[in-house]
């Protein structure tokens, strides 16, 4: 089958497996192997075949008939010869050509309908591509985020180990207390639990990455901030209305419904055909010898009554047009809601990150002061451990917010049908649309 080649037509290609894996490479790998994309591509092929069937209505149909067998005739011809029950070796050969000349533009409307169906199906494939690429990006970012949380948790555990060692030394030398040792061991156990939990989450993230991408992650790198983000909410909504493939598919669905109605209007017109034919028959209907004909006929057929079926079909077509219009309105409302929520998320995360960064910076400064005060006996090791725990939580919160912001940016681009383009896959996407 040619679908792997089709999908590869709008990808840059898979990079060597021995190198690190960029986000673009992960997306490429996902798009090449995802079965939902393959299924959508087959749907495009099916719609294209329907379009070709519609175009065939412009072309003539040619039929060849060959028939041979025994004939026993008792008619006026055989009775005139005195042989009322004569047997013949009947042989028929005919070829006919039928060319539509006029059908009330039904064929033209049917072709436009199938072209609209093909365009809608292609846009649904584009939707599948955008959504699948977005899931790939989400899995990619999650692996990075969880790995960073593991690193922070391990640093925090190391600090607990160092602090516990110092407190045990102070206790053994008679300076510290047993309570300090017990408290530090408890906090160290909690820190170890955090490491184990973060490692489990990181492993689960790798499992999810494999499910989405089709291979295990390898040396992932933090992607840069995407380009092409809208500057205002109004701009984001308009971009989504103009470029979102779901909206385009709904618009083409409406066009297909309108063309279906125009096709039905052709039923109220006569149909005119050119019929050409030639026959070469032998020993037919009791007449011995050759019986040859050549015909060239223009035929007109005009239905006068079909039990009200045409009127009912027209009502159905109008109802489908109205339904498609309402579906498009509902989709635009949904897109407006999605874009607005994503825009609010972006603004909220941007503000939160500023405060989270301030929290991290302030906690780092506080830790430096605590260490200075520890040196002169104004702070205990447990005090330092407390501020180190707070710094771990602050850094973890900042990491999560930064990755949430990046994912929200990707989602906003995908809602506007621009995510693949922001990844540098614009030419490949255009090749799909022109297909």
What kind of region is each of these model predictions?
Residues 1-7:
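Bacterial N-terminal signal peptides that target proteins for export
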Residues 7, 397-435:
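Acidic, low-complexity, intrinsically disordered peripheral segments
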Residues 11, 18-67, 73, 100-101, ...:
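Bacterial Sec-pathway N-terminal export signals of envelope proteins
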Residues 27, 94-96, 140, 297-299, ...:
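Membrane-embedded beta-strand positions in outer-membrane beta-barrel channels/transporters
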Residues 38, 61-83, 87-88, 98-127, ...:
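Small/polar (Gly/Ser/Thr/Ala-rich) solvent-exposed segments
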Residues 90-92, 138, 183, 271, ...:
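Transmembrane beta-barrel architecture of outer-membrane proteins
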Residues 128-242, 253, 342-345, 349, ...:
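Periplasmic alpha-helical coiled-coil/stalk elements that build and connect Gram-negative outer-membrane
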Residues 171-175, 374-378, 415:
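A short glycine-centered flexible hinge/capping loop motif at secondary-structure junctions
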